[in-house]
């Protein structure tokens, strides 16, 4: 009888411990799923703000990296490297951090603005850029990645040269940037 009572008590303790461990594991899973859902909602909010700013033509593209002539990307200072679009007026400046050059601010205008979405949900914007310092217009393609404000920009010049730029999109007026000396021609 004592053995039976001892066996039942042991089984009861082990089963209650297993139930508590299972409940604790389920709580951890629920917390992990809630964190994932919150992170996904935050990413979607950032993407929605960036895509709305691009469609409204009022955005600031903070440049992180620029592809230089030999094909490698070089980092830039994203507080002073940017492309700004306000309706049809643009301002652009790239600061590679070189001690030999200071950032120059270049103004321009755009035309033929087109916006579309691909199969993955990425926003693709195309337009023609005419800067005041260049006689040739440049075709610009911007691809905003879904659920992010990360954007890839490709600038195609008339002579066939392409420049690839990576950065982030933020609504105009939400970030403070350094503006260099305007280039006047």
Feature locations, PLM:
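Short hydrophobic/aromatic-rich beta-strand segments that constitute the beta-sheet cores
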Residues: 61, 89-93, 151-155
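Solvent-exposed coil/turn segments that connect beta secondary-structure elements
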Residues: 66, 86-88, 94-96, 147, ...
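Surface-exposed, interaction-prone regions used to assemble/regulate multi-protein complexes
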Residues: 53-64, 176, 181-184
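Mid-length scaffold segments of soluble, non-membrane domains
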Residues: 75-128, 132-135
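Sec-dependent signal peptide cleavage junction
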Residues: 17-60
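Bacterial Sec-dependent N-terminal signal peptides
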Residues: 1-27
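Helix-rich interaction surfaces within compact, conserved domain-sized segments
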Residues: 115-185
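N-terminal post-signal-peptidase region of extra-cytosolic proteins
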Residues: 45, 63-78
């Amino acid at each position: 009888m004592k053995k039976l009572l001892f066996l039942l008590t042991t089984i009861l303790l082990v089963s209650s411990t297993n139930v508590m461990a299972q409940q604790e594991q389920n709580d951890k899973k629920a917390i992990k799923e809630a964190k994932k859902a919150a992170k996904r909602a935050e990413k979607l909010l950032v993407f929605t703000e960036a895509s709305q700013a691009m469609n409204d033509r009022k955005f600031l593209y903070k440049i992180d990296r620029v592809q230089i002539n030999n094909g490698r990307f070089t980092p830039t200072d994203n507080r002073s490297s940017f492309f700004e679009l306000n309706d049809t007026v643009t301002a652009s400046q790239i600061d590679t951090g070189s001690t030999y050059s200071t950032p120059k601010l270049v103004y321009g205008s755009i035309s033929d603005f087109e916006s579309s979405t691909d199969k993955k949900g990425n926003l693709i914007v195309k337009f023609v850029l005419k800067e005041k310092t260049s006689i040739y217009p440049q075709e610009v393609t911007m691809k905003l990645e879904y659920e992010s404000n990360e954007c890839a920009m490709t600038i195609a010049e008339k002579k066939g040269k392409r420049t690839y730029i990576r950065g982030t999109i933020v609504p105009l007026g939400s970030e403070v940037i350094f503006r260099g000396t305007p280039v006047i021609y």
